[in-house]
Amino acid sequence: MKNKEKDMKWTTLDSEYLFRRPWLTARKDRVRLPNGHVIEEYYVLEYPDWINVIAITPDDKFVFVRQYRYALGKTVNEIVAGVCEEGEDPLETAKRELMEETGYGGGEWTKTATLSPNASAMSNLTHCYIARGVELTGGRSLDEGEDLEVC
């Protein structure tokens, strides 16, 4: 049996960074497919890995955050999510983000999946967790740009 990953791998012929920012980097690549076809402009968005957490209290209530999302132009309810710091274990990121955004901690944690948010254009992964039995254990510690409510 052939190694399908090797057969399907694209070759990068050239790569140019269009811009680099702390939360987003855009790159334009020139690539060759295994069949020889060359794509002159293939755009890639480089992001750090993310986490998201479905948090459930001992009395089976879900912990959400509510905040305004500029890109959507509206206020929405969300599960806890955040960016993995460089070198940080995704589970530790998830626990840190849950505590920082909601004040909830503890519980039993299970990793449910590692997914690509958009494999055709984004370089990062999303690490998904369920935290059962979380309790309000500490104070929140929001980043300067965060204004959210726990619901």
Language-model features: locations:
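Extreme N-terminal tail/first-helix region
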Residues: M1-R21
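Short, solvent-exposed loop/turn elements at beta->coil junctions and helix N-caps
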Residues: S15-L18, A113-N118
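Active-site-adjacent beta-strand/loop module that shapes the phosphate/pyrophosphate-binding cleft
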Residues: R27-N35, N118-G138, C151
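A short coil-to-beta-strand element that immediately follows conserved catalytic motifs
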Residues: T11, G105-T112
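Beta-rich strand-turn-strand
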Residues: E88-T93, E101-E108
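Acidic, metal-coordinating catalytic segment for phosphate/diphosphate chemistry
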Residues: D14-N52, P58
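Conserved Nudix-box catalytic region and its N-terminal flanking loop in Nudix hydrolases
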Residues: K2, D7-K9, Y42-Y47, N52-R96, ...
